[in-house]
Amino acid sequence: MGKITFYEDRGFQGRHYECSTDHSNLQPYFSRCNSVRVDSGCWMLYEQPNFTGCQYFLRRGDYPDYQQWMGFSDSVRSCHLIPHSSSHRIRIYEREDYRGQMVEITDDCPHLQDRFHFSDFHSFHVIEGYWVLYEMPNYRGRQYLLRPREYRRYHDWGAMNARVGSLRRIMDYY
């Protein structure tokens, strides 16, 4: 079980809303979100309702300002509690529809291009576990939640291009 508290103002001030489950529309509870406290669980925050828009991964901890979670604005309109998984395995492909060179990984990778010498990554098959995909190396840039399923092209995980820099397992739940 997870617990997250959203605050309208920076530094955990102003109106707040406590949550322990997925919410597809947080708009009725607060108009803006400038700070967050995660008491338990791992969460993906979304800039828009219905789990759309920019995504932000948060684990247990205090985030006194939206820039602390790499946010572009104070807009948080939906959230997803990420289920626990004990094992992680993902296949990454050089081309769309699982074509081209394929590699399977089970650990974090801070710099995919250096490790695998692909210039782009066009499809993924998440076999086990939940992962955060980052647009740039060293876990920076836009973030995308990957859950166990197939992603035949970059549009399937919500990206506008096939630029992928790093990949991290979601493991820290408490």
Swiss-Prot record:
Signal sequence residues: none
One Pfam family linked to the record: Crystall
Swiss-Prot/TrEMBL keywords: Eye lens protein, Repeat
SUPFAM superfamilies: gamma-Crystallin-like (SSF49695)
GO biological process: lens development in camera-type eye; visual perception
Source superkingdom: Eukaryota
Claim: Repeat is one of the keywords in the record: yes
Residue ranges of the region described as Connecting peptide: 84-87
Residues that span the membrane, as ranges: none
InterPro entries referenced in this protein's UniProt entry, alphabetically: Beta/Gamma-Crystallin, Beta/gamma_crystallin, G_crystallin-like
GO MF terms held by the record: structural constituent of eye lens
Beta/gamma crystallin 'Greek key' domain sequence ranges: 2-40, 41-83, 88-128, 129-171
Domain notes: Has a two-domain beta-structure, folded into four very similar Greek key motifs.
Leftover remarks: There are six different gamma crystallins identified in rat lens.
Homology family: Belongs to the beta/gamma-crystallin family.
Primary role: Crystallins are the dominant structural components of the vertebrate eye lens.
Protein name: Gamma-crystallin F
Gene: Crygf
